[in-house]
């Protein structure tokens, strides 16, 4: 057809074109020259480098026939050798977990070390002269790669097979070029691989042990193999960095290499456990080598021995560099502090160390957090040194440190059912004593230090101060952490008591359940003792014993029916108070309010003690104990627990003076109410109606409707804020008459944001015109939508005076009262026995009775001094009453003046104790002063 006319191509042009197309491979330096024809187009070069991931700017300056730099050639070779599928298939974790690849890298590492040493004096590597040993080396590598390809094919590892196949093709090309007499650069020869056969192992061992002192510490990462040329260039540029063969760095590198070779040998012997052990030991050298390369000090006394001398036990970790951050990760709890300042300094130092550790690990966020806490402690220490009060409850507590005030030691945990039940028996028989018992008998293992008295003795020494000071120290549990611990211990005690009761009733399943709940509290108790916050909402509720508020004994024959009825009324009131306390305690527990929870727990315990007193008096056929009502004010949460979060109750109570249609009288009105709540939308609004109430204009419907809501739904919020509930008052029609709407009313529900109940009396409108009628409605939800509804209520609280279980017998107290003769009724002639306030004597008598009752309930003997005190108080009170009855007006005047002196004495004592900081003792003195003042006023009237 058409012939191509043009100059004939010069001879040899076809071979050049074939080389450019990649058909002929020429590794000579002349073959790497960039020709000046169209192949050297900058656009093609940029496109090629963009495809292989390079930077086009690196080759823009290369013009003419100058050779490419070796760095660019090596980079292009590495990019071409990289397998994209392999990068996608495996991850760093898979590569590191592949023991075959690690062994291969170790052999490569040994071969590179051999190649680095002769290249150190030169600046740029030059092609070596023809060497007859190159062909033998290529033949050996060819056999190794053929075996490796076959092994990878049998193992089904496609990534390794492709990698070895590329190396095999490169070796074949190099071998052909070597046979033609071309110069072969040793750096172009693929490295040896682990073929899994004996000769290959011995060969690699001879190569890897030829050099043990590389310039930089090798790491078992695949990137080391790729960066070997740059490492060689850096080494040749700075030969003075080579370590001394006898230096610690060379010694560690040699020992690490021995462990790697031993791991490879153990792996090929199918001893994977030993291979993994040697590999772990070799990896433990990496941080030490890095520390030595940075010039840090290293303790080499704990280095593991060579592999052949390693004991069968797990090896010790390699020595760590001596740096400021090399501290124990798990700090020990320091000695108990002597004062508040030392406690603050200990905790500040712990957070300072934690900040240093976080910085050393590179965790800047945690380091900044610990530094902020250190600043808080520094401010607290400065405030304490300046004499200002320090709120230690606001300071974070380090893990493992108890709160600064100290906590009671934990009871030993019981591991068996019998042991737990024995502990529960002891706890059930042991009741808390009164406050006065705490004054005289200090608790064991209770610290005496408090924030108000930082210079008090530590918890190891028992308090030796007066009774009020001991009481104040024992009540230093005002912090949240201590309240939390006391609450958890009390709940565990209640659960153990419930388990004991269930076991006594042969309810094994119930006993096991309560024991499991008690054991489940131990992690919370441990965390609370260490100063960590716990979620008390997850604490199981207190078990309730129904028999606690039941009079099980029968009354004696001498008890009247009126007394039995009064006992029943008191029991009912105490049961109601106890249930109310438990309900409020549960609500505050779910909210995490530990202070209010403990408050209602104590009130519930008081109700139980009052019930115990009532039971004892009932069993002994005594008259009802002295009972009184007190006004108690509580802050409670208003909630309707019988409703779920998705329920809303609508109450239509009644209508008041509803309008009547024209021509009908109010007695002819048959009314009902229908409502419309536009949620979830107007089309699917919730609608219903009441029943018809006939013949009245003030019907009482008293009906309730349960509506479905979603508290978090935006449509529900929009419905209660803008729409509400629409009501229609309707007159029921007759047989051929339709229903007639008398008026409408609208209830707004925006109050539910902050309240759980809306109670309104709505005005019935005819359009916009008032009709004079009213409609009473009410809406309830479980709890408010945005915040808790706190209410302050005042209750009439029943308090029963405690009586001792077994009062020490006072033989003939009236016989010991000396009768006052007639002549002694005058002032100054009475007995020399001192007078005391009868109210104060009654207070002391009641206090001693409570103490004796507590001892009896705990099945402990009454101390003789306590019994003697009680007997003395009873005798003094009876004697003084007889004196006042027989003494006349003169003795009463003297008694009044004596009360005035006691009033002044207690006033001064309360003021002095308040200045001294003894708050509890000052409160007691003030209470006695009020008793004397009340008695003096009654006496004057």
Swiss-Prot record:
Compositionally biased tracts (Pro residues): 303-318
Biological process, per Gene Ontology: apical dendrite arborization; dendrite arborization; endosome organization; negative regulation of snRNA transcription by RNA polymerase II; negative regulation of transcription by RNA polymerase II; regulation of postsynapse assembly; regulation of respiratory gaseous exchange; regulation of respiratory gaseous exchange by nervous system process
Tissue: Strongly expressed in several brain areas including frontal cortex, cortex, mesencephalon, hippocampus, midbrain and hypothalamus. Also expressed in testis and at low levels in pituitary, liver and kidney. In brain the highest levels are detected in hippocampal pyramidal cells and raphe nuclei.
Compositionally biased spans, kind Polar residues: 228-239
Main location: cytoplasm
GO cellular component, one term: synapse
One Gene Ontology MF term: DNA-binding transcription repressor activity, RNA polymerase II-specific
Low complexity bias locations: 467-476
Entry text on domains: The C2 domain is required for the repression.
Protein name: Coiled-coil and C2 domain-containing protein 1A
Lineage: Eukaryota, Metazoa, Chordata, Craniata, Vertebrata
């Amino acid at each position: 057809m058409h012939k191509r006319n043009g100059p004939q191509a010069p001879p040899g042009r076809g071979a050049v074109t074939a080389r450019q197309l990649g058909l002929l491979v020429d590794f000579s330096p002349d073959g790497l020259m960039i020709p000046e024809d169209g192949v050297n187009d900058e656009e093609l070069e940029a496109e090629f480098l963009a495809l292989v991931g390079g930077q086009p700017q690196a080759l823009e300056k290369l013009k003419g026939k100058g050779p490419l730099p070796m760095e660019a050639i090596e980079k292009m070779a590495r990019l071409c050798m990289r397998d994209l599928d392999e990068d996608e298939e495996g991850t760093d974790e898979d590569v590191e977990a592949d023991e075959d690849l690690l062994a291969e890298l170790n052999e490569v590492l040994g071969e590179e070390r051999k190649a680095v040493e002769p290249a150190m004096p030169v600046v740029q590597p030059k092609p070596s002269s023809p060497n007859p040993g190159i062909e033998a080396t290529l033949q050996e590598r060819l056999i190794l790669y053929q075996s490796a390809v076959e092994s990878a094919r049998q193992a089904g590892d496609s990534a390794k097979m492709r990698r070895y196949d590329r190396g095999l093709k490169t070796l074949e090309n190099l071998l052909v070029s070597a046979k033609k007499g071309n110069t072969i650069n040793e750096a172009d020869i693929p490295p040896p691989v682990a073929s899994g056969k004996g000769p290959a192992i011995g060969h690699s061992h001879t190569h890897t042990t030829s050099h043990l002192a590389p310039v930089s510490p090798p790491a078992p990462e695949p990137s080391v193999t790729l960066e070997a040329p740059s490492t060689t260039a850096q080494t040749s540029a700075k030969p003075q960095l080579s370590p001394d063969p006898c230096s610690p760095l060379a010694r560690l590198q040699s020992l690490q290499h021995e462990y790697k070779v031993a791991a490879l040998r153990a792996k090929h012997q199918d001893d994977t456990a030993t291979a993994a052990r040697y590999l772990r030991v070799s990896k433990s050298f990496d941080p030490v080598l890095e520390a030595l390369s940075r010039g840090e000090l290293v303790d080499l006394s704990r280095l593991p021995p060579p592999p052949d001398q390693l004991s069968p036990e797990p090896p010790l970790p390699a020595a760590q560099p001596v740096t400021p951050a090399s501290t124990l990760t798990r700090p020990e709890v320091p000695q108990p502090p002597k004062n508040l300042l030392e406690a603050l300094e200990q905790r500040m130092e712990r957070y300072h160390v934690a900040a240093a550790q976080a910085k050393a690990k590179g965790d800047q966020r945690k380091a900044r957090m610990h530094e902020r806490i250190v600043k808080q402690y520094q401010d607290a220490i400065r405030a304490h040194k300046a004499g200002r009060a320090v709120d230690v409850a606001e300071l974070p507590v380090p893990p493992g440190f108890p709160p600064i005030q100290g906590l009671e030691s934990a009871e030993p945990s019981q591991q068996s059912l019998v042991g737990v039940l024995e502990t529960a028996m002891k706890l059930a028989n042991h009741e808390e004593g009164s406050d006065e018992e705490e004054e005289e008998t200090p608790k064991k293992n209770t610290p005496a230090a408090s924030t108000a008295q930082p210079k008090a003795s530590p918890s190891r020494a028992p308090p030796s101060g007066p009774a009020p000071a001991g009481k104040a120290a024992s009540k230093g549990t005002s912090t949240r952490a201590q309240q939390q611990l006391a609450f958890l211990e009390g709940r565990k005690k209640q659960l153990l008591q419930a388990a004991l009761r269930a076991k006594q009733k042969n309810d094994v399943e119930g006993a096991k359940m309560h024991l499991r709940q008690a054991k489940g509290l131990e992690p919370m108790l441990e965390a609370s003792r260490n100063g960590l916050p716990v979620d008390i909402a997850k604490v199981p509720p207190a078990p309730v014993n129904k028999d606690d508020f039941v009079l099980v004994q029968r009354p004696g024959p001498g008890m009247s029916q009126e007394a039995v009825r009064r006992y029943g009324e008191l029991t009912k009131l105490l049961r109601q108070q106890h249930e109310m306390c438990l309900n409020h305690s549960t609500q505050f527990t779910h909210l995490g309010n530990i202070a209010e929870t403990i408050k209602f727990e104590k009130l519930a315990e008081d109700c139980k003690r009052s019930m115990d007193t009532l039971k004892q008096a009932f069993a002994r056929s005594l008259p009802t104990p002295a009972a009184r009502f007190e006004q108690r004010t509580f802050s409670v949460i208003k909630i309707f627990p019988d409703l779920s979060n998705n329920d809303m109750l609508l109450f239509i109570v009644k209508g008041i003076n509803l309008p009547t249609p024209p021509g009908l009288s109010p007695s002819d009105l048959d009314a009902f109410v229908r409502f419309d709540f536009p949620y979830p939308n107007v089309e699917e609004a919730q609608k219903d109606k009441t029943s018809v109430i006939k013949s009245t204009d003030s019907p009482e419907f008293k009906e309730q409707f349960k509506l479905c809501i979603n508290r978090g739904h935006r449509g529900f919020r929009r419905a209660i804020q803008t729409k509400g509930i629409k009501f229609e008052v309707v007159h029921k029609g007759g047989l051929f008459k339709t229903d007639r709407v008398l008026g409408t009313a609208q209830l707004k529900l925006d109050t539910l944001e902050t309240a759980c109940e809306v109670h309104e009396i709505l005005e019935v409108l005819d359009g916009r015109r008032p009709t004079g009628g009213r409609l009473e409605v009410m809406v309830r939800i479980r709890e408010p939508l945005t915040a808790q509804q706190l209410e302050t209520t005042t209750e009439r609280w029943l308090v029963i005076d405690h009586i001792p279980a077994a009062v020490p017998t006072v033989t003939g107290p009236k016989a010991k009262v000396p009768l006052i003769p007639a002549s002694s009724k005058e002032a100054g002639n009475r007995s020399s026995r001192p007078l005391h306030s009868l109210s104060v004597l009654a207070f002391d008598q009641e206090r001693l009775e409570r103490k004796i009752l507590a001892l009896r309930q705990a099945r402990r003997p009454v101390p003789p001094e306590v019994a003697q005190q009680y007997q003395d108080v009873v005798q003094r009170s009876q004697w003084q009453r007889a004196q006042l009855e027989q003494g006349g007006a003169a003795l009463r005047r003297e008694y009044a003046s004596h009360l005035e002196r006691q009033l002044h004495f207690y006033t001064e004592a309360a003021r002095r104790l308040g200045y001294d900081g003894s708050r509890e003792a000052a409160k007691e003195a003030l209470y006695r002063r009020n008793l004397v003042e009340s008695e003096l006023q009654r006496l004057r009237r």
